Amino acid sequence: MPYAIDELQEIIGNLRTELVEPIDSGGVNNTRLGRDRVERMSAEVVDSNPYSRLMALQRMNIVKDYERIRDKAVAIVGVGGVGSVTADMLTRCGIGKLILFDYDKVELANMNRLFFTPNQAGLSKVAAAGATLNFINPDVEIEMFNFNITTVDNFDRFLNAISQGGRIAGQPVDLVLSCVDNFEARMAINAACNERNLNWFESGVSENAVSGHIQFIRPGDTACFACAPPLVVAENIDEKTLKKEGVCAASLPTTMGITAGFLVQNVLKYLLNFGEVSDYLGYNALSDFFPKMTLKPNPQCDDSNCLVRQMEFQAKPKPVVVEEKADNEEPLHATNEWGIELVAENAPEINPTSTETPVVGEGLKLAYEAPEKSSETSEETVTTAPPDDASLEDLMAQMKSM
């Protein structure tokens, strides 16, 4: 049956709407297969509970109160290979709030890395990431900023966002994560966190894509990024002059994913207070080598705020380590049926063949003393060996006489 013109126009309009909606929502059609918000995390083991595997960490005594993660806010600067995967992991872990910073767009050249999909090409990275993350976990509050933090005007906006964008309005974020790919942005993050005294993680992957690292920076306590800057920063070299036309850095989703995994693992340990947070953790893919170290702050750092934080940290009272004194416990058993005595570790060894009484430590005594040998010598029975040519009868006669 042929359609009327009005009906055809309506069909075309509906098709056009279906095509435009995913683009407006960051390339994700949120009307399909979504889930409702969850008010409280539950440990109930059912297929419909998105947090059952996470809450199991409490039952296994790894985390005391996992639901505290909903009270935490984390800022991620750079939503590329490492940053997008980091945001994805934290969203699946149920973080309370994510603040995303990036000014780049999704390109097909990004498809070798994780998270983004081809239909998101052309969208801003923060818009594409925010839409996907909201679809994965609608319980997470996501705030997006599409600007370059290294410019003068935008730096103030960035500073205000991390110092006022906490889970509680007007409070700073709990942690800042640097997932950028240039030193200029790292220095901007470093300056902001030193100024506002915020802890942050720096992360990165090498240009040849076979190594990566994370570094936990606590202003005044550990070295900031300006305390031991890379050669490019120390020599004030413009990074833009190092880029060549037609040449790009290598990128592997494996190295990106491993680095992001290390980063999120330490973020969770820091936020939920379990395990040991690494100050610096590296990764060499060629030899599967994982170096760890701690970098002390540079007293001659070029960042004036870093020097202020160092003075504040040194002025803090150091925690007093109290040595526990062992209580004088009563003996468990009043009787000593077997005559067991304790011997000091530094007591000389007793030679069982020696006739001398060994000297023992003060307060100790020997449990057994060897009897003295009698001065009277016992008669020794001398047995002469039979001659080689003795007969069997002679040997038997000798044995009978013994």
Swiss-Prot record:
GO terms for cellular component: cytosol. It holds the Pfam family ThiF. Zn(2+) binds at residues 224, 227, 301, 306. Residues 369-402 are annotated as: Disordered. One of its GO terms (molecular function) is UFM1 activating enzyme activity. The active site is at residue 248. Belongs to the ubiquitin-activating E1 family. UBA5 subfamily. It comes from Drosophila erecta (Fruit fly). The keyword Zinc applies. This is Ubiquitin-like modifier-activating enzyme 5. The keyword Endoplasmic reticulum does not apply. Transmembrane segments: none annotated. InterPro entries: D-isomer_DH_CS1 (IPR029752), ThiF/MoeB/HesA (IPR045886), ThiF_NAD_FAD-bd (IPR000594), Ubiquitin-activating_enz (IPR035985). Keywords: ATP-binding, Metal-binding, Nucleotide-binding, Ubl conjugation pathway, Zinc. CDD domains: ThiF_MoeB_HesA_family (cd00757). One of its GO terms (biological process) is protein ufmylation. E1-like enzyme which activates UFM1. SUPFAM superfamilies: Activating enzymes of the ubiquitin-like proteins. ATP binds at residues 81, 102, 125, 148, 182.
